[in-house]
């Protein structure tokens, strides 16, 4: 896969944003990068195939510094700095740029974060595989959003069934485990807050949330937006929880964004995925 630095013919990039989740920040990155004083020709903008700007980089003190425009609009000051430096523009397909951004930040997680201890057994994986095949079928195609993906059990199975997973979780140690085990890929998964997933994720054909919870009365305000976000951006959605009460909460929250999920009991797993919401 082509890295962002290679796309703009630059050396290693130092991003203003410390992590992928910060790419939606409309304030500080734009201010900080404009403190640079690039020489003529030492500025780059990366456009997608439709001419949308996605990345801005400048060279200062011998190093390339970058900020992402994947989820925000360039500021007037940034564009002025580019023009002053008489910078160059490059162009790549948007999907390739998105993958490269995910790789940029998730690759650092894989390299620098110690993975959590293995949390899956072959028996558990097979139970989830059987459930997903029952609900979705086989020979699938399209994108599958894997919400609160953990170490990637859902992504690995949906990839086997033909989907292209896009996964997220807010636990970088679990993500690191997923990367080291091969269940997750660094260009397919990111560390973000699932309560604002639609700020980063596209609409998708499929959505899964394996073992959501545990949900309690005092954590419902956390889980409700997570469910609403996943249900709101996916056409077919499957969420598993441990208790029937949690399943009814999930059904209610999905209905709030116009989605009808039906509840069923999953006898394969007496603990983690006992109740299924699907629709």
Predicted regions located by residue number:
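Conserved alpha-helix/loop element of class I SAM-dependent methyltransferases that forms part
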Residues: 119-141
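Conserved SAM-binding strand-loop segment of SAM-dependent methyltransferases
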Residues: 184-196
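Conserved class I S-adenosyl-L-methionine
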Residues: 139-150
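N-terminal accessory interaction module
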Residues: 2-100
């Amino acid at each position: 896969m082509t890295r962002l630095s290679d796309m703009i013919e630059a050396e290693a990039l130092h991003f203003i944003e410390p992590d992928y989740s910060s790419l939606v920040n409309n304030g500080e990155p734009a201010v900080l990068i404009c403190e640079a004083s690039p020489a003529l020709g030492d500025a780059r903008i990366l456009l997608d195939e439709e001419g949308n700007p996605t990345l801005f980089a400048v060279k200062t003190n011998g190093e390339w510094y970058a900020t992402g425009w994947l989820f925000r609009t360039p500021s007037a000051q940034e564009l002025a700095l580019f023009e002053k430096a008489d910078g160059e523009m490059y162009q790549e397909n948007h999907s390739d740029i998105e993958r490269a951004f995910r790789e940029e930040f998730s690759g650092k997680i894989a390299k620098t974060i110690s993975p959590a201890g293995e949390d899956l057994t072959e028996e558990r994986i097979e139970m989830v595989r059987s459930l997903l095949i029952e609900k979705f079928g086989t020979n699938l195609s399209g994108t599958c959003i894997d919400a609160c993906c953990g170490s990637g059990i859902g992504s690995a199975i949906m990839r086997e069934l033909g989907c292209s997973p896009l996964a997220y979780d807010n636990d970088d140690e679990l993500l690191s485990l997923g990367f080291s085990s091969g269940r997750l890929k660094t260009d397919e998964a990111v560390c973000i807050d699932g309560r604002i997933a639609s700020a980063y994720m596209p609409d998708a054909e499929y959505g899964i949330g394996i073992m959501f919870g545990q949900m309690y009365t005092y954590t419902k305000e956390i889980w409700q937006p997570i469910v609403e976000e996943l249900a709101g951006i996916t056409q077919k959605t499957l969420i598993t929880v441990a208790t029937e009460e949690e399943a009814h909460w999930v059904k209610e929250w999905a209905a709030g964004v116009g989605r009808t999920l039906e509840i069923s009991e999953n006898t394969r797993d007496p603990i983690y995925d006992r109740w299924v919401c699907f629709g």
